[in-house]
Every structure is written in structure tokens, then in C-alpha cells.
Regions:
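Conserved RecA-like ASCE P-loop NTPase motor core of nucleic-acid helicases/translocases
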Residues: 50-62, 83, 217, 251, ...
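Inter-lobe coupling/hinge region of RecA-like P-loop helicase motors
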Residues: 4-8, 13-27, 53, 103-110, ...
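Conserved RecA-like helicase ATPase core segment
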Residues: 4-7, 33, 37, 43, ...
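Conserved helicase C-terminal RecA-like lobe
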Residues: 157-160, 351, 365-377, 390-392, ...
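Short glycine-/polar-rich loops that comprise or flank the Walker A/P-loop
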Residues: 21, 50-54, 79-82, 120, ...
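Conserved helicase NTPase motor core
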Residues: 6-17, 21-26, 36-37, 49, ...
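Conserved two-lobed SF2 helicase motor
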Residues: 85-87, 188, 192-193, 557-564
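Conserved P-loop NTPase-based nucleic-acid remodeling module centered on helicase motor cores
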Residues: 53-143, 154-159, 169, 326, ...
Length: 604
């Protein structure tokens, strides 16, 4: 036990060893919050206050969840694979896989990532003869997701004008389309989980009794629905627990709330204090990441915000290098200065991959990239295409999804004529009309079309049926390999000018499946870690949930370019912040929005 608590500072120790009560831990940047969360879980288990299956730990990235599991495994002699540790989306996916019937879903329901959701909405609007120039699909997607994140279904949405009335109607059509095809988007994972718990009291009581301690990381980034889901499980959300409710241990920092544009509600932290009648608010203020000059500047800036819960970061690391300010004549002058400074640092022995150039908007990167390219400085832009977002990978995954669920129209539409099979736009439109009239999936409607289109479509349907039969007894990596060959994807990319890279990515998908089976195949836990659909359904869920969180590196030391949002939680030896001027950073919209300038300060 002494080893477990060794080297914690006094506030960290107080947080880790709190009695079983609700608590809010205000954790400043670099204050060791991950260590506190993980050690809290280990301490609760090692002192016998709760078993591993009585813990629900929520993170905001899969990377953070895996890090927590890894640290716990090193602290305690337990198998952490079966524990409920993950993101909101990952945990709700696991819950719905276990209770798909009660949730009104097929056993092998598929998850739409953001790109798939947008494609599904485009297809919907096209079927409804909606002008997508006048009504952009991306705006409708934002409208739908924003309502779901508030817990609002189409039937409950307020149509206060004709324009909104149309969007509400399309929202309802989208809900029906997803239900018919057996697919859910990210927001639906959480909303459907919440609704099921709310209406099924015995099931809610089961999970309330099971999870005695709920621990949440990055609480300041929760949206309204996520907070409602947590309250429900903790016994404060409309379904009273049969016994005592769970203890909610929330770790967050109101000064780091920078995702209002994604629906994050900074007010959730104040609501938590009021609704859970918190007696325990502990502040972690000692910073282990930065020097004093940086912290003094950050404290001075953030104290201008009103309504803060209050912290003042400090460090024992000394003052460090002073913050330098350079006033440029133009963006070109600024970029040239930054790149020349990088060159000087590299010549002095500083590694390029420990240098980051941050900007408020992606558009600012162009001039920086030009200067870096001109002076032959290797760089990497964070936010480029990620592995699971790459065209060839998404095509292969679409074939996998069709094998798992032939009613997945989004997957069908993606690959029915890829590689090219002579199925043109008119044939697809005729198929969509036939499916609409028959109220069936595109796959089931394909056989009803006659003529050349029908023959081509019939061959495609036969290919999918053959693949379903051929792969039934194969291991997951073998399934993917068979699909890549039989679908024609490998042959197609052999003739592509970027073919070698794309084929290597397809081979990497096979490797990813092998690694997934190795990591997850033994995750028996409490019996519900692997969904009823087996390894294929689990891997498809993994691909959607993980989509791009781990960007593939090129093995070359490079300067890192990214937005300030993308930089959250990362550390570099040298950081340049470009475009610190009115209209860029702070952003021009900051003065138009309530509390906009305060969010810009938090972002800085």
C-alpha cells in the first residue's frame, strides 16, 4: 500500500484516499490527474472497497483508456481487460452489444463514423430530392448530432420556423433510415443507451448496483447527454437506485474547457457541485510540466475570466526561459522567422519532433508549410488523413460491414461499383427507387432489377453471398485477406499511381486485425467484452471507434504543425504560437459569441 501512494503530493494523496463520497478534483494542466485517477482506482480495489467489476472509468480518448488499463495492470495483480474502462462511445457500444434486443437493434448493428454518417445523410437527401447546395448535408448532420447530444429526438425537436421544420422532418427520416439499416452514429450510441436505462428500470438498477464507483476524466468536456447518462448511473437521474447510489469522482478543469463547439457544457461542473451537493472539492495546482514563466503568464491570462472555480498553478521547476515575443510585418514574415528559428535550434542539436508550431485555424498552416518546404525542413501536419479514414481502408471495411450486415446501405453504396463493375449512376438511382418503394435495403432490392443493371447488380450480390459463405469459418485476418482479393481491391490498386502505398495500407489492415485478436480475443472479463456478432462485429466497432486516433507516423523526425485544439494534452520542448492578433487568435467570432473571449483565453 505504501508503494501505491508513494511520491504523491499532499493534494494528490487527499484525492486518492477520499472516503466513498462524491468528489470534484480540479486538476490544472500538468498536475498529474491521470496518475490520481489511476491510483484512486487501484487504492479502492486494493483496500477491498470495491472489486474490479464495480468500477466504471470514463475517458475521452481510447489512448487514455488504454494508458489507464496499462498503469492499473502494473499496479495490481489483476486482469484489467474485462474492466469497464473506456470512452463514452466505447462503453455505450459495449452496453448496447449486451442489450441489443432491449435497445431495438440487430445483433450485428454497425457504427457510422463521421464520414459514413455524412454519406448516409447525403444519400437520404438525394432520395428525398433535396437540393444539397441549398441544404448542405454537413449542416443537417450538425443539426442532428446537436439535438441528440441534448437528448432530443426528432419527435421532440422544436420546429419554430419553416426552415427548421424541414430539418426536423429530415431528422425523422434519418432516424428511420438508420433503424431500417441497422446502423447507429456516435451520438446515437449514447442517446440509445441513456434511453434504454431510463425506460428499463430493472436494467438501470442492475448497473446502478454494479458500478459502485464512477470515475470520469476531463469532466469539463462532457456534453449535456453525457452528464445525464452519468447522473442516471450514479442514481441522481430520474431512476432512483434500490440501494445507495454510486460515488461519482469527477476530474476536470474549467480553465481547460475548449470544446464548446462540440457541445461541451462548462456549466456541467457547476451543476455537479449543486446537484450532487459536493462536500469534497480538491485542487491540484502543482504543475510538473512547465516552468514558472509560462505558468505566471497562463495564470495572469486566465484570471481575467469570470465565474471560474479558481486555481493558481505553481511549480518547483524554476522560472525557466523567458517567453519571447516577435512582432512580424506579415504572415510571410512571421512564417519566415519561425522557420529560421527552427533551423537555428536544429543546428544547435534540438530534435525536430520536439518542436511544435500552433495556430488557431487550419488555414494558417499554408504559409508555414510553404516556408518549411522552401527551406527543406521536414514537417508533419496533424489532422491529415488517418489510417481508418483512408479511401482503400474504408472500402475494405465497407465490404466487411456488408458481410456482417447486408442491410447496411451506406456500405453497399460505397462499394457496389468499386472497383468498377459497369453499374452507373442511373442504375444506382433505379435501385434506390426500387428499395424505397419496397421499403427494403439496397441489397435486397438489387435482385429485383432486370436487364444489364440487374445482371451487374446480381453479380455483386452473388459476390457478397459467396464471401459470406467462404469466410464463415475463417479467422478474422483471413477474412479480410480473402475480401481484399475477391473484391478486386488489390488488383485495382496494382494499376493505381498510388497503388503501392494503398496496398501496404490494406496489408496493414490485416495486421491490425491480427493485433486486435491478440489484444481483445482473450478479453473474457465478465463475459460481455466481445459482442454477440463475434470478432468481425467487434473489429468493425473497433475500427469506427478508433478511427484515426492513432495517426501513422512516417518514421522521420519532423516539426509538428497543428491547431491549438489538437495540441491539448501534448508536450514539446519548443512551442511557437503563430497569428496572435485580433481576428486570428483571438478568433474573429469570439467577440460575436457569449463567453467567446473567455474560451479563447482557455484555449491559449
Amino acid at each position: 500500500m505504501s508503494d501505491l501512494l508513494a511520491n504523491l503530493n499532499a493534494p494528490q494523496l487527499a484525492a486518492v484516499t477520499l472516503p466513498p463520497q462524491h468528489a470534484l478534483i480540479l486538476a490544472g494542466a500538468g498536475s498529474g490527474k491521470t496518475r490520481v485517477l489511476t491510483t484512486r482506482i487501484a487504492w479502492l480495489i486494493s483496500t477491498g472497497q470495491v472489486g474490479p467489476q464495480g468500477i466504471l472509468a470514463v475517458t475521452f480518448t481510447n489512448k487514455a483508456a488504454k494508458e489507464m488499463q496499462s498503469r492499473l495492470a502494473a499496479m495490481l495483480p489483476i486482469n484489467t481487460r474485462g474492466m469497464w474502462i473506456g470512452t463514452f462511445h466505447g462503453l455505450c457500444n459495449r452496453f448496447l452489444r449486451a442489450h441489443y434486443r432491449e435497445a431495438g437493434l440487430p445483433a450485428q448493428f454497425q457504427i457510422l463514423d463521421a464520414a459514413d454518417q455524412l454519406a448516409a445523410i447525403k444519400r437520404l437527401l438525394k432520395n428525398l430530392n433535396v437540393d444539397d447546395q441549398k441544404f448542405p448535408p454537413r449542416e443537417l448532420m450538425h443539426f442532428i448530432n446537436a439535438h441528440k447530444e441534448q437528448g432530443i429526438r426528432a419527435a421532440q425537436a422544436e420546429a419554430y420556423d419553416q426552415f427548421t421544420s424541414r430539418r426536423v422532418a429530415w431528422y425523422a427520416e434519418y432516424e428511420a433510415q438508420c433503424q431500417r439499416e441497422g446502423v447507429v452514429d456516435f451520438a446515437e450510441l449514447l442517446l440509445r443507451s441513456y434511453e434504454l436505462l431510463q425506460r428499463n428500470e430493472p436494467l438501470c438498477h442492475h448497473y446502478q448496483a454494479r458500478f459502485r464507483h464512477i470515475l470520469v476524466d476531463e469532466f469539463q468536456d462532457t456534453n449535456r447527454l453525457q452528464y445525464a447518462w452519468l447522473k442516471l448511473l450514479a442514481g441522481r437521474g430520474g431512476v432512483p437506485p434500490e440501494g445507495g447510489g454510486a460515488c461519482l469522482f469527477a476530474v476536470g478543469d474549467d480553465d481547460q474547457s475548449i470544446y464548446a463547439f462540440r457541445g461541451a457544457e462548462i456549466g456541467n461542473m457547476r451543476d455537479l457541485q449543486r446537484e450532487f451537493e459536493l462536500a469534497n472539492v480538491i485542487r491540484l495546482e502543482q504543475n510538473y510540466r512547465s516552468h514558472g514563466n509560462i505558468l505566471d503568464a497562463a495564470n495572469s491570462l486566465i484570471k481575467q475570466n469570470r465565474g471560474r472555480l479558481g486555481k493558481n498553478l505553481w511549480t518547483e521547476a524554476g522560472a525557466g526561459e523567458p517567453i519571447r515575443v516577435f512582432e512580424a510585418f506579415s504572415d510571410i514574415d512571421e512564417a519566415r522567422f519561425i522557420v529560421e528559428e527552427i533551423g537555428d535550434l536544429v543546428r544547435a542539436g534540438a530534435p525536430r519532433d520536439q518542436m511544435a508550431v500552433l495556430y488557431r485555424s487550419n488555414a494558417q498552416s499554408r504559409v508555414l508549410e510553404h516556408q518549411l518546404f522552401t527551406l527543406a525542413v521536414p514537417y508533419r501536419v496533424h489532422g491529415g488523413l488517418r489510417f481508418f479514414d483512408r479511401q482503400e481502408v474504408k472500402h475494405a471495411l465497407a465490404y466487411l460491414r456488408l458481410i456482417a450486415n447486408p442491410d447496411d446501405d451506406t456500405a453497399f453504396a460505397r462499394v457496389v461499383n468499386f472497383p468498377t463493375r459497369g453499374i452507373g449512376t442511373r442504375s444506382i438511382e433505379a435501385l434506390q427507387e426500387a428499395a424505397r418503394c419496397a421499403n427494403s435495403s439496397l441489397y435486397n432490392a438489387a435482385a429485383s432489377l432486370a436487364g444489364k443493371a440487374g445482371t451487374s447488380l446480381a453479380r455483386f450480390v452473388r459476390l457478397i453471398e459467396d464471401l459470406r459463405s467462404e469466410t464463415r469459418d475463417l479467422l478474422l485476418p483471413e477474412v479480410i485477406d480473402r475480401i481484399i482479393d475477391r473484391s478486386g481491391l488489390r488488383q485495382h490498386y496494382l494499376t493505381d499511381k498510388e497503388g503501392q502505398d494503398r496496398i501496404e495500407n490494406l496489408d496493414e489492415l490485416i495486421n491490425a486485425a491480427t493485433g486486435f485478436l491478440r489484444e481483445e480475443g482473450g478479453a473474457s472479463g465478465d463475459g460481455d467484452a466481445m459482442p454477440d456478432g463475434g470478432p468481425l462485429a467487434a473489429f468493425l466497432a473497433h475500427a469506427s471507434l478508433e478511427a484515426g486516433e492513432h495517426q501513422a507516423g512516417e518514421g522521420q523526425e519532423a516539426v509538428q504543425l497543428m491547431t491549438v485544439h489538437a495540441a491539448k494534452g501534448l508536450e514539446f520542448d519548443v512551442v511557437f504560437i503563430s497569428g496572435l492578433e485580433q481576428g486570428l487568435f483571438p478568433h474573429e467570432n469570439a467577440t460575436l459569441e457569449r463567453d467567446g473571449l473567455e474560451e479563447e483565453r482557455r484555449l491559449m
